[in-house]
C-alpha cells in the first residue's frame, strides 16, 4: 500500500432535533413518506481516525453502553467505504468520544455513520465526491444523508430528499432525557401506522401539497417575540401516551419561563424546549438544572449550528 498523506484526523459529529416531523404515508418499499425539518445542534460526538497497517477496522469508545461490533453504524460505514475503494489493505483505528445519548431520538448513530464516511474519505485519500458520499450515506440509514451537509434542512421521502432551509434561527435549546429509557424507532412507527393508517395520503398530488405547504410556511412567519411557535411531531402522540417519562419531560419543559415551544425529537425519548437565544436558554437551564435532575432527567443546553459533519 502506498503511503497515505494523512495519518490521523478528528471529526465533529453533531446531534439533530426535529423542528417538524410529519408522516404522510407508507411507501411501497416499506418506509414511511415523511415531511420534516431537521436542525443540527452543537451537542456533538468526536471521532478520531488513525491509519493502521493491518487492514482492519478497530473501534473503541469511552461509552460502556455502546456496541462496538459489526452492528455499529461506524463499522458498517467504514466497511462500505472500504469496499468501494477496492483496497483491502486499508485499515483504521477509530476512537469515538460519545457525548450524544444513545437511543435518544437525536440520531447520534446516524451522525457517526456520516462522520465515518467523511473522515475515512479524507484519511484514506479516496477523493470521493459529494454525490458518491451521499449515495453511500443513504444506504446506511434514512437520517444519515442529512448530516453530510447538515445545518437546517427540509427532509422528504424517507429522509434522503434534502433541501437547504435558509433560516436565521438563533434559538437556544434545552434537552431532557431519562437516562434509563430508550425507545424503538421501528416499533413507534409501526404503532403509528396501525392507528393512523386510514389517514395516510398515498397520492402524489397530496404528498406534493404537504411538501409545498411546509416549504412556504415552515417557520418563515415566525417573529422572535414572546409568542409560542408550532413544532410538530406526529410520533409524539404515540410515545407520550405510552411513556410517563416523556409525558413528564414535556410537562416540565412547557412550564419553563420564556419557553417558545417544546416537543419530542424523532421517536424520543429526548424532549426539547426552544428559547429566543442561547443566553436565555442558559439562564433558564441554570435556574432549573437541579429540578431536572431531581425528576430523574439528564439535561443539556445547546445552540443551533449551520453545519453537519466537520473535519477538525
Swiss-Prot record:
Query: Which Pfam family, giving just one, matches this sequence?
Result: GHMP_kinases_N
So what EC number does this one have? 2.7.1.148
Tell me the residue numbers annotated for binding ATP.
Answer: 101-111
Q: According to the lineage, what is the superkingdom?
A: Bacteria
Q: Which GO terms fall under biological process for this protein? A: isopentenyl diphosphate biosynthetic process, methylerythritol 4-phosphate pathway; terpenoid biosynthetic process
Note the SUPFAM superfamilies from the entry. Answer: GHMP Kinase, C-terminal domain (SSF55060), Ribosomal protein S5 domain 2-like (SSF54211)
Query: Which UniProt keyword terms apply here?
Result: ATP-binding, Isoprene biosynthesis, Kinase, Nucleotide-binding, Transferase
On whether ATP-binding is a keyword of this UniProt record, the answer is yes
User: What NCBIfam families does the record point to?
Assistant: ispE
UniProt similarity note: Belongs to the GHMP kinase family. IspE subfamily.
Its job: Catalyzes the phosphorylation of the position 2 hydroxy group of 4-diphosphocytidyl-2C-methyl-D-erythritol.
Q: What is this protein called?
A: 4-diphosphocytidyl-2-C-methyl-D-erythritol kinase
Which species is listed as the source? Prochlorococcus marinus subsp. pastoris (strain CCMP1986 / NIES-2087 / MED4)
Gene transcribed to yield this protein: ispE
Amino acid at each position: 500500500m502506498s503511503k497515505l498523506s494523512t495519518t490521523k484526523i478528528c471529526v465533529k459529529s453533531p446531534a439533530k432535533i426535529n423542528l417538524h416531523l410529519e408522516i404522510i404515508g407508507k411507501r411501497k418499499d416499506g418506509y414511511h413518506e415523511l415531511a420534516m425539518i431537521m436542525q443540527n445542534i452543537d451537542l456533538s460526538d468526536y471521532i478520531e481516525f488513525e491509519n493502521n497497517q493491518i487492514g482492519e477496522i478497530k473501534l473503541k469508545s469511552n461509552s460502556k453502553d455502546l456496541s462496538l461490533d459489526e452492528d455499529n453504524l461506524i463499522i458498517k460505514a467504514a466497511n462500505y467505504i472500504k469496499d468501494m475503494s477496492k483496497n483491502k489493505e486499508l485499515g483504521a483505528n477509530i476512537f469515538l468520544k460519545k457525548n450524544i445519548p444513545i437511543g435518544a431520538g437525536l440520531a447520534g448513530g446516524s451522525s457517526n455513520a456520516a462522520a465515518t464516511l467523511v473522515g475515512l474519505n479524507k484519511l484514506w485519500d479516496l477523493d470521493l465526491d459529494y454525490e458518491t458520499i451521499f449515495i453511500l450515506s443513504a444506504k446506511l440509514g434514512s437520517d444519515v444523508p442529512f448530516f453530510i451537509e447538515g445545518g437546517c434542512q427540509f427532509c422528504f421521502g424517507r429522509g434522503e430528499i434534502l433541501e437547504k432551509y435558509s433560516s436565521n434561527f438563533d434559538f437556544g435549546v434545552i434537552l431532557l432525557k431519562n437516562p434509563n429509557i430508550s425507545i424503538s424507532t421501528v416499533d413507534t412507527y409501526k404503532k403509528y401506522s396501525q392507528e393512523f393508517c386510514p389517514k395516510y395520503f398515498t397520492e402524489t398530488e397530496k404528498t406534493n401539497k404537504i411538501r409545498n405547504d411546509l416549504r412556504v410556511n415552515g417557520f418563515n412567519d415566525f417573529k422572535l417575540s414572546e409568542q409560542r411557535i408550532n413544532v410538530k411531531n406526529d410520533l409524539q402522540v404515540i410515545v407520550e401516551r405510552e411513556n410517563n417519562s416523556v409525558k413528564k419531560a414535556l410537562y416540565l419543559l412547557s412550564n419553563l419561563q420564556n419557553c417558545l415551544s417544546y416537543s419530542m425529537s424523532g421517536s424520543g425519548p429526548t424532549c426539547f424546549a426552544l428559547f429566543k437565544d442561547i443566553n436565555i436558554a442558559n439562564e433558564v437551564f441554570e435556574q432549573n438544572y437541579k429540578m431536572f435532575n431531581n425528576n430523574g432527567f439528564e439535561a443539556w443546553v445547546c445552540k443551533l449550528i449551520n453545519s453537519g459533519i466537520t473535519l477538525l
